[in-house]
Amino acid sequence: MTEPRTPEKLLAAKPPVLHHNSHSPNASLQLPSPIITRRTRTASTSARALENPVVTGMVKSFSRTKGHGFITPNAGGEDVFCHVSDIEGEYVPMPGDEVKYRLCAIPPKYEKHQAVHVQISHLTPEVHHKWEEPFYGGSSPAK
């Protein structure tokens, strides 16, 4: 019988291995390599992610143009990478949004984790944009 997987054990197992040449929306954060998207994730990896508990955190950064961001887990530990394909719901995440998600091990070594099935549970008071709204590179068009 295997030991239950808790968010603390998943995050503390090994620190994420980061690609040294990757850049993220926040200069101090590094992107994992390879980046696994919902489309490229295998069925078995997706099934394992669904076995993991739902955890909570806060969006640290998210770039709609780059298609990724990072979540700071409420339980502490390393910030978790999040790909745009794993965001569920109608709103684009913004820094400060509270989210719930599951951790998914990233192949081939399954040492790193990323956030999947990400749902915004509490929006920041700032104006949020829906995915279907036109995007103008961070600024609104002149009226």
Swiss-Prot record:
GO terms for molecular function: mRNA 3'-UTR binding. SMART domains: CSP. Residues 54-121 form the CSD domain. CDD domains: CSP_CDS (cd04458). SUPFAM superfamilies: Nucleic acid-binding proteins. GO terms for cellular component: cytoplasm. It comes from the Eukaryota. Residues 1-30 are annotated as: Disordered. The modification Phosphoserine is found at S22, S24, S28, S33, S139, S140. PROSITE patterns: CSD_1 (PS00352), CSD_2 (PS51857). One of its GO terms (biological process) is regulation of mRNA stability. PANTHER family: CALCIUM-REGULATED HEAT STABLE PROTEIN CRHSP-24-RELATED, COLD SHOCK DOMAIN-CONTAINING PROTEIN CG9705. This is Cold shock domain-containing protein CG9705. It comes from Drosophila melanogaster (Fruit fly).
